[in-house]
Design a protein with these regions (language model features):
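Hydrophobic h-region of N-terminal signal peptides that target proteins for export
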Residues: 11-19
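A short beta-strand-turn-helix
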Residues: 24-44
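Structural microenvironment flanking redox-active thiols in thiol-disulfide oxidoreductases
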Residues: 58-97, 108-112
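Thiol-/selenol-based redox modules, centered on thioredoxin-like
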Residues: 124-163
Length: 163
């Protein structure tokens, strides 16, 4: 019970910090994403990558891709947030064939505001769900080769039974 209370307080704190994110972002392909508008249309899940070449992070994206048909029924869209450089993140996008926007977190500004900094060049791998006020409504922090957080994500999205 104490763990749940602590997680709840952390989520409230993170949500407060995330309110400073811009309504509009640009992805690595130069496309503009109106995040404010997007969150009113769909559930927005942000997948953070430790680095563009993080194999566990790439596997997380591939796991989501393998179950995309089931996820599409959940009215969810994804954004991938990672440190640069852009060309390395472009390689990760091509490798995973993930059809959603990849965003370079310049100077790790967004990750820093979410307290997701491992060091000055890496982001803590996580999954975040945003609400229409651009606040973090749900978060799953951390990922490793044995644990991806998929069951929690699917439960939150009400898309259980996909794994």
């Amino acid at each position: 019970m104490l763990v749940l209370k602590v997680q709840f307080l952390v989520m409230i704190f993170i949500a407060y910090l995330f309110a400073d994110i811009p309504d509009v972002l640009n992805d690595i392909d130069g496309d503009t994403i109106n995040l404010k508008e997007l969150t009113t249309q769909k559930t927005v899940a942000v997948i953070t990558m430790k680095s563009p070449d993080c194999p566990v992070c790439q596997t997380q994206i591939l796991r989501i891709m393998q179950n995309f048909d089931k996820l599409s029924a959940c009215n969810v869209t994804f954004l991938v947030l990672a440190p640069g450089p852009i060309d390395e993140l472009q390689k990760a996008k091509e490798l995973t064939k993930f059809p959603f926007p990849f965003i370079v977190d310049q100077n790790l500004k967004i990750a820093r505001s979410l307290d997701l900094i491992i060091n000055e060049t890496q982001i803590l791998p996580s999954i975040l769900i945003l609400n229409d006020k651009l606040e973090v409504e749900w978060t799953q922090r951390g990922r490793n080769a044995l644990y991806f957080g998929d069951p929690e994500l699917m439960k939150r999205l009400k898309c259980e039974g996909w794994i």
